[in-house]
Structures are given as structure tokens and as C-alpha cells.
Amino acid sequence: MVASTFADAFRFMPSHFSLLLEKAAQTAELAFAALAIALLIALPLGLWLGHRHRGLLLALSASSLGRSLPSVVLIGLGIAILGVGFWNNAMALVVLAIAPILTNTYFAVEGVDSDAVEAARGMGLTETQILTRVELPLGLPLLLAGLRIAAVFVIATATIAGIFGGGGLGDIMARQVTYGLGGVFAAAIWVAGLALLTAAALALAQRAASRRTAPRA
Amino acid sequence: MTGFRLADGGGPVIPNYGEPSACLRHNGWFCTDWIHEHWGDTLQPALIQHIQLTLIAVGIGFVIAFGLALVALRFGFLDPPLGVFTDFLYMIPSLALFQLLVPLSGLTVTTVEIALVSYTLFILYRNIVVGLRSVPPDVLESARGMGLTRRQTFLRVELPLAMPAILSGLRIAIVATISIATVAAFLIQDGLGAPIFDAIGTPDLFKTELLAAGGLAILLALTADLLLAFAQRALTPWNRLR
């Protein structure tokens, strides 16, 4: 039974290649739009709070709250407020992505060795310079780790949108009657692939960033 | 897959209960009369089912993850493949995993539990391994020097020192499971996902049921998170500052 589903999935991939590609593009569009909006909100806030060493409670409760919001509930509320479509799903995903980005950014900047920050301050660097030249480079690995967690989580959760007519690879997963179990499995493999590719891209970015900052540090 | 429950009054129109209130007729956001009327037959049972789903999944997941972690610590070469295996389980989207298990175990709670357990493994396994491994070697050395047996060292030194990581893993796993368990209603009428899916599936989207059941799911997760945060503090008094 399992083996035949596996075989079906690998037959489904070439026969429905253009469908999978189209749906994967929809999932990627939705996930990346949500991530971009979440970054715009959470990154400046996390950097600022971390730099000022304020808002520990906010950072901690953001992560608790973010974890506690079931995606099904958020997407349902999105539909109730905005109707079925791209933006209600994007809104739900933005809310989910903010938590890990905000918390990790906060702890990335807040956790930078205070001796390094004091030394920079003693050398006459302004607060902005301290943030961009000392705290950001040193905190970058943790910050990017948060982004990676958020990205993988958002891509996997974007499929839930398919249940409620949100399109994307979740659309195939929610319609076993049409595409068969092989199709469901094929779509799942593509989602995992998309998540892996994104995580790998962010890991590469992380390595490139740390190489660029290394001589200065 | 989740049928509409018209017979037992799951929708906004309740023909057998007399006139619906103005709030229900306008599909209001929070019609207290509906909540009063359906607390006993819809919301409370769903909440209890949800708690059961979560506790069983995390309980079984914890036992398996603990066993795997002990194996990985004893035979170090097994750690990378076990880590990759639990990672892989976590990457299968829940919507797909629930369906993929149906041919094996049918449209049952067992199917849902297997999927939920497999998601907890990723979080719990990592945290238990990291926690047990973070015990400094000189601490182990001095425990041995004090004449503790291997078993005593594990129970009195390694386990307490690994407790913060294990508890934070449990906390994340429980909250995540509460969230993922709502997706289970795509398969079977069980847990808080059932009224949530019903509400979304109702023509016009039944807002009161969505908000009541969804609110309960969020409250349950927040309560669990808070309780475990207190447990973390109580059980690791030496770790208060963080």
C-alpha cells in the first residue's frame, strides 16, 4: 500500500509537471510575500528593542503568542474578515512569521557580548554604527536562523490555505478525490523540496554574510 | 470532507429551537446565546477531545524521543541519521501526512495520533539530545569521583542538568501539537478543529462558532504555554535569571 502510493507519487510528478510547477509558484509567491511583510514589521522592531535591551517581555510573549495561534484559526479569521483569497492567507502567514523573526532578532542583538558593544562605544561609534557594524554582524547567524525557521514554517503552513481555496500545492493535497493519494504525496514532496531549497538558500546567504563581515570583526 | 452538521444545530439556522436571535440571524461575531446553548453539545466535548489528542500525542512522543535520545547518546553514530529522520517527518505537511496514513490505519483517532506523535519527535528528540549532551564533562568526572554509579549519575546529575532543555522542548511540542491537532478535523470529527471546520464550511461562514472554537484553541495553547513556563521555573530554580 505504501509502496504503491510512493510509485503513484513518482508517476504523478512527470505527468502533472506543469500543474505542480504552477501550484508551487503560487505557494512560493504566498509564502515569500508573507515573509517579506513579516520581515518589514519584525526586523526593525527586533533590532531596536534588542539594541536598547528593552522589551524582553514583548519578545518572549510574541514567541509564545505566535506559537499558540493555530493556523487553521488564523486562516478562518482571515476568510471571515477579508474573504477567500490571497490576502487573507497572506495575513495569517504574516502573523505566524512575525513571532520567530521578532524573537530571534531580539535575542540575536540583545545577546551580543556587552564588552564588544562597550568597546565600540568607547571607540566613539554612534548608536546606529554600533547596531549596524557590531551587533548586526555578530548577531547575524541567530537572526538568519530565525528567518530560516520562519520560512520553513510558513511554506509548510501555506498548504493549509489549500483546504479553503487558497491555491498552491495545498490545493492538490486537499483534493485527494481529484488527484489521488499519489498526487497528495507528490505535492507533499514538492512542499518539502521548496522548504529545503529555501532553507539552503538562507544557509548560503548566512555563510556569505559572515564571510563578508569577518575581516571587519 | 467535514460534512455540515445541520441536524444538531451546528449552523446559524436552528429550525428546531424556535426563533434564532437577532445576533444569529445577522451572523454576529459572538452570539452568547449560541455559545450557551452549544457549550455542552459542541464546544466542551471538542475541547476535551483536543486535550486528549494533545496529551496522548506528546506522552507517546516523549517516551519514543527519550528512548531514541538515549540510544543516540550511547551509540553516537546513530545521532545524525536519527536527526535527519525526525527532521524529515517534520517536513511532511500535516495536511498530507494525515491522508497518507489513512490507508494504514483508516479514518480513526489512531491515524491522527500517529501523525501528531511524529511531529512531536522532531522537537523533543533534538531538545533531549542537546540537553543531555550539554552536561559538562568535568561535572560527570566529579560525579564519578564522588563514587556515583552510572545510574545515579544519570538520575541525579545528567537528568536535572538537562531539565531546562527538556522542559522547553516539551513546552514547544505541546503548544505546536495543540495547533496542528486542529488540522485533524480535515479527516475526522475530533477536537476543536471540528467546529472550526464546520464554521468555515457553513455558507456565509458561521462567525460565532469560528470565534468560540478558535478562541478556545488559542486559549488552550496559551494556558499550556503559561503553565509549562511556570513548571520550567519551579523545576529549575538554579536557572531563574534566564
Show the residue positions of the predicted features.
Chain B
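Periplasmic/extracellular loop-to-transmembrane helix junction in inner-membrane transport proteins
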Residues: 3-57, 202-203
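Hydrophobic alpha-helical transmembrane segments of polytopic membrane proteins
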Residues: 192-232
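Transmembrane alpha-helices
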Residues: 55, 118, 150-184, 212, ...
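Loop-to-helix entry region at the N-terminal start of transmembrane alpha-helices
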Residues: 42-53, 102-123, 209-214
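Short cytosolic juxtamembrane segments of multi-pass membrane proteins
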Residues: 232-242
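Short cytoplasmic-facing helical segments at TM-TM junctions of multi-pass membrane proteins
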Residues: 127-166, 196
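Cytoplasmic-entry segments and transmembrane alpha-helices of multi-pass inner-membrane transporters
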Residues: 68-101, 126-130
